[in-house]
């Protein structure tokens, strides 16, 4: 354990970097770091911390980067031993920009888990939670005053995104929801409030059913990754991708897609990379196709990388 006196001998120093990883730490005592006001980088990776409290990080007002990767106890599956992050545990970290909490078994977020992180730009929560199956409009409410740019939520067994789950994150640029178990129809309201979004990564999820409004609220989107998500309803009209005039990269690979319309990619004049491999598009380019070949690539004047591998194509329309 650390206590308020552990680092008192360093009070005359200007220490900026402290690595406490692999120390079997179980307890971060109140005011442990109060002697280190110049600290900018702190690593507590690979420890057995059982609890963070509102004064665990007191005094670290200049900290820029904090890694809590595998920092918490993982010893038992019983509910009682889940590590606990008290509300306001991060409240003193006014200048923190980077926070990594990957690979832990924390129950979920509370309404003030991240309160006070008013400079936070990068938050990685990959394989962090045990009970985050549903994202709601309260999950990230404590980030409402954080200028967050990147949020990594991979490998959390997330199965549903409710309306407005990210509505607090108006500056977010990159949202990574890959490698989860999301299984739902995308109404579009899931992305409400993401006014600055640049990339949404949804690849490797269970089942996504599209609607014409699936991406209507994120016209700023430039990269959309939908690889291996058992994608359904791609052939609806108007196309789900129609609002995405700024899109440059679209990945629809490994979805066994067989039916699409000519207007699937209509209006995507900025599209540069299209990954469409491992689908079932063979029939669409055959002369014998009812209604003739489906020219779904028309108008894509900026396209310079096109992957149609493993689609069974044996005819290319003239």
Language-model features: locations:
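Extracellular leucine-rich repeat
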Residues: 1-318
